Amino acid sequence: MLLERSFYNNNWERFDFVKNTIDVKEKTSYDLNLRISFTEDYPYNDFSMIFTVFDAYGDPYRAKAYKFNLKDSEGQWNGELRDECHTFELPINKSFLIADPGKYTFQIENYMPITPLVGVKELTLYKK
């Protein structure tokens, strides 16, 4: 697990970045996935986020915007139903390379236009 967060009252504020710093000892490659759970209160058909990795100096090492379709054209959820939440396992980056040892901060930014974003229960960024 690289980072995780459960959201108070299932609400995620727009500029409440989810982040964690890890110490990378040697050159490594990760297959990164995001597990995210939504309640029935989530009002949108998709979810947008920005994933950023910062190097030891605080400079952006990699950054990418993502948009995931959560519901079909009729508004039905695509994700697996677990514990009354719709849970998705989403690929973030296959073979994400960190070439130099050091401390790296992984950050996920809610990139949806409305704050707070209602219906987000929890998320976990993990290496496969």
Model-identified regions with their sequence ranges:
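An anionic, turn-rich surface loop/hairpin at beta-sheet edges
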Residues: 65-97
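Solvent-exposed strand-loop boundary residues in beta-sheet-rich modules
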Residues: 55-59, 74
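Extended extracellular/luminal ectodomain segments enriched in beta-structured repeat modules
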Residues: 25-32, 101-102
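Short coil-to-beta strand junction motifs in C2/discoidin
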Residues: 43-49, 119-120
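Short amphipathic, basic-aromatic surface patches that mediate peripheral association
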Residues: 34-42
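Mid-length scaffold segments of soluble, non-membrane domains
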Residues: 42-44, 58-61
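Transition segment at domain starts
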Residues: 1-25
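Internal, hydrophobic beta-strand segments that form the core of beta-sheet-rich folds
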Residues: 98-128
